[in-house]
């Protein structure tokens, strides 16, 4: 049976934390900042953790991610 491969697009978007969680970056940060407040832009800079409902699905795509 062949090995399960890592989903490369997901591997570029998620990082494993030391405690075993998954860190992600926020959407809506590439353009059109004139419609967003300063507070929104500041909060979009911060990384966030993957929610528990999505964790299992994303973890299965990142089988060999350290």
Curated annotation (Swiss-Prot):
Belongs to the bacterial ribosomal protein bL35 family. This is Large ribosomal subunit protein bL35. Disulfide bonds: none annotated. It comes from Streptococcus mutans serotype c (strain ATCC 700610 / UA159). Residues 1-16 have a biased composition (Basic residues). It comes from the Bacteria. It holds the Pfam family Ribosomal_L35p. One of its GO terms (cellular component) is cytosolic large ribosomal subunit. Transmembrane segments: none annotated. PROSITE patterns: RIBOSOMAL_L35. Coiled coil: none annotated. One of its GO terms (molecular function) is structural constituent of ribosome. GO terms for biological process: translation. Keywords: Ribonucleoprotein, Ribosomal protein. Residues 1-21 are annotated as: Disordered. SUPFAM superfamilies: L35p-like (SSF143034).
